[in-house]
Amino acid sequence: MAVINVTSEIGKLKKVLLHRPGKELLNLTPDKLDELLFDDIPFLKMAQKEHDAFADILSKNGVEVVYLEDLAAEAVSQSAEIREKFIKQYINEADIYSEYYQKMIYDFLNAIKDPKELILKTMEGVNANEIPFKNTHSLSHYVLDSGSMVINPMPNLYFTRDPFACIGNGVSLNKMYSVTRCRETIYGEYIFDHHPEYAGKVNRFYNRYDAPSIEGGDILNIGKDVLAIGLSQRTSANAIDSIANNIFDNETSPIKTVLAFQIPAIRAFMHLDTVFTQIDFDKFTIHPGILGPLRVFEITRGTKKGELNVKQIDSTLEKVLEKYTGAGKIELIQCAGGDKIAAEREQWNDGSNTLCISPGTIVVYERNDVTNEILNKKGLKVLEMPCGELSRGRGGPRCMSMPLLREDIR
C-alpha cells in the first residue's frame, strides 16, 4: 500500500498532516511582520483552540490527523548521526556565520534531549538571552541586542500546504519563494529521508535545493492524470517547466497533462488555492477577481527528453475544467456571490480557500458568512471552524492542511 496517495482534491480524506501553532507566534513582533510575511500577530492561546477545533472536525469525520512536529521528531531520533546532521543543517540554514556562535547554538540545541522539544525549539527560534555568549571582540557581538532573535521563528509553519505537496504517490519538496520560508522545508526533507514510514518509499518530483520557487498552495490534483499548478507570485514558470519534466520522466507517474493557471502576481492572490479550490465533482469555489486576467496553458510531454509541448488554451475556465475533470457541466461558485465589497472582504479572509474532505463536504472559515450561505444553498455540507486568530496569517483550511492519503475517485 502506498504511504502517499493523493490523486484528486475531493476524494475521501483518510490522513492529513497539520502543525499546531506554537511558540513561534510569540516571537512575532511588529517590526518583523513584513519580513516574516504576517499582517498581524495572532493570539496564540486562541489560535491553538481554533486549530484544535479544526483537527477535531477532521477526526470526527474519519480523518487520521498527524502532526509535522511529531513526524519530524520521529525522523531525527532514528540515530545520533541524523540528529547531529539535523541540528548542524538547521544552524547553517539560519545563516549563522561565526564558528563561535555556531558552536554555542549547537551546544544549546543538542542539550535538548527530547526530540519533539528539539523540533519545537527549532520552529520557535532562538533568542540571544537563551545562550551565554561571551564577548568575542567582534562587531557582530557588539551589535547583538540583548533579547533579540539570533535565529528567527517560523510562524508560517501552520500552513502545512506550502513546504511540500503530495502528487499521486510522490511529493514535491518545495523551494519556497521567500527567504524567510525556505527553512521550513527542512522538516519535510528529514521526514522523507529518514522517517521509517516514508524513507525510500516516496517519489520526489521536486527538491528544496532546486532554484526556481514553487509552493504547495499552487499545486492542485485535478485528477489521476491531470495536475494543475498556479503560475503566481510564489511559483515561477521555470519551476513549472522543471516539475512537469520530472513528473513526465517518472515511469510510475500516471500524470499526462499539467495545466498552468496564470493568476495576478499579488499578495491577495498569492497562491492558486487562495482564489480557486475544488469542492465537488462538478463544483469549484473561485474569486471573481481572477476571471478576467486568468490564462490557462496545457503542458504535455515533448518528443524529446526534457522537451515540453506548451500551448495556451483558448476557452472558458468552465470548458477547460469540464474537459480535464470529465465531470460534465462545471459550476464556478464565486466568493460572496460576486458582490464586489463582500467578495473582497471575504477573499481577504480566505473565502475561496476550502478543504474538501469528501465530495461535497468542505471545511471553511466561519467568518465568511455570505460565501458559506451560498455554499449551503448549493447543497454542500459546510463544516465551519472558528478562525478569528488563525485567519490573521492569511490562509484558510486548505492552506493549513496537507493531505497524505485520499481515496481515489472514479
Curated annotation (Swiss-Prot):
EC number: 3.5.3.6
Gene Ontology BP annotations: arginine catabolic process to ornithine; arginine deiminase pathway
GO CC term, one of those recorded: cytoplasm
Active site (record annotation): C399
Entry's localization field: Cytoplasm
Keywords: Arginine metabolism, Cytoplasm, Hydrolase
Pfam families: ADI
Record flagged with keyword Acetylation: no
UniProt pathway annotation: Amino-acid degradation; L-arginine degradation via ADI pathway; carbamoyl phosphate from L-arginine: step 1/2
Uppermost EC category: hydrolase
Catalytic activity: L-arginine + H2O = L-citrulline + NH4(+)
UniProt keyword Coiled coil present: no
UniProt-recorded Gene Ontology molecular function terms: arginine deiminase activity
Gene3D superfamilies: Arginine deiminase, L-arginine/glycine Amidinotransferase, Chain A
InterPro entries according to UniProt: Arg_deiminase (IPR003876)
Alphabetical list of PANTHER family matching this protein: ARGININE DEIMINASE (PTHR47271:SF2)
Similarity section: Belongs to the arginine deiminase family.
Protein's UniProt name: Arginine deiminase
Organism: Treponema denticola (strain ATCC 35405 / DSM 14222 / CIP 103919 / JCM 8153 / KCTC 15104)
Protein encoded by which gene: arcA
